[in-house]
């Protein structure tokens, strides 16, 4: 069989840079254990990936989507805590009301509690 060149694939993917990116991505998929859609014929993964593109057993659109998905990353957004969420929504924070008890009032209340107990 004749060697596969980029020329065999240019009619499927006109941009040579994109073709190389897609073929490299497919070669990495094959290295990771993806099923081949053409016979290996003792070729290395990059050549097999170019043959798959040339024979259209792997569509350029599907490869492009998989390449994009593999390069995307998920960013986890921290959710605000309940108190912060209530304030953001215009409500009041869920916290105990502050007592305006002075030290003198506290001591008096303790003395009364001990005297009654």
UniProtKB/Swiss-Prot annotation:
EC number: 2.7.7.6
Keyword check for Transcription: yes
GO annotation, cellular component aspect: DNA-directed RNA polymerase complex
GO MF annotation, one: DNA-directed RNA polymerase activity
Database matches in SMART domains: RNA_pol_Rpb6
Subunit structure: The RNAP catalytic core consists of 2 alpha, 1 beta, 1 beta' and 1 omega subunit. When a sigma factor is associated with the core the holoenzyme is formed, which can initiate transcription.
Protein name from the UniProt record: DNA-directed RNA polymerase subunit omega
Source organism: Ruegeria sp. (strain TM1040)
Gene expressing this chain: rpoZ
